[in-house]
Amino acid sequence: MSQLLPAVEIETGSGDQPECAVIWLHGLGADGHDFEPIVDELDLDDLPPIRFVFPHAPTRPVTINGGYVMRAWYDIVSPDFSQRREDAQGVHESAQQIEALIARENARGIPDQRIVLAGFSQGGAIALHSGLRHKQRLAGILALSTYVPLADTLAAEAHTANRDVPIFMAHGHGDTVIPYDFAQRSCALLQAQGYPLQWHPYFCEHTIAMEEIRDIDVWLHKVLAPNA
């Protein structure tokens, strides 16, 4: 098992043992605290107790930022997200670390089918990459302001266990970090391969809109409902 990443953890409920988990991955240069406030913005009182896990990505030099060392799930070599220049090794290493976090939740009593993988930007890319290759059915994948990394390998590497996993994918029309049309191509790729994907566009930039938070809340109530 890969060494466990340090993480911020927040549990909902009144001290009851969590029955579900949301592993939420931050974006480039941020850390696990970045999305910590979103827990209070979601209306989760009528769901089973949830453990939110916000891991801190490892630090590494990022080529697009002049080699500056920052928290990143993988290196970004080019702003055009060319598949020929993707950091496949970094993506695979991060996927292994996410597998270790899932295994820890299993050890703490939460089965795979009650775990959501979530992420923003780079974190969303790793959530998609890891979730679609995971060997046990997950509750869902929440992919915000992101894209499918190593897209050419997905068809061959995707695991049948998650062929029908619910995917919530959202993007801002004004995103200049990961262009909207690039994210749309990732959406089209997943839909062409038969994944049950919900596509949510918003009038915002590279961020999360208030309307988006409400839609995430609705989606979480579907995939983490007691009888889901």
Locate the predicted segments by residue:
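Serine-hydrolase catalytic machinery in alpha/beta-hydrolase-like enzymes
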Residues: 2-113
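C-terminal catalytic histidine-bearing segment of alpha/beta-hydrolase fold enzymes
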Residues: 181-228
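Alpha/beta-hydrolase-fold catalytic nucleophile elbow
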Residues: 55-56, 118, 142-145, 170, ...
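Conserved alpha/beta-hydrolase "nucleophile elbow" surrounding the catalytic nucleophile
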Residues: 26-28, 115-120, 172
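Short beta-strand/loop motif that positions the catalytic acidic residue
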Residues: 168-171, 175
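Short, proline-enriched alpha-helix->beta-strand connector loops that line the catalytic pocket
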Residues: 20, 162-167, 193-195
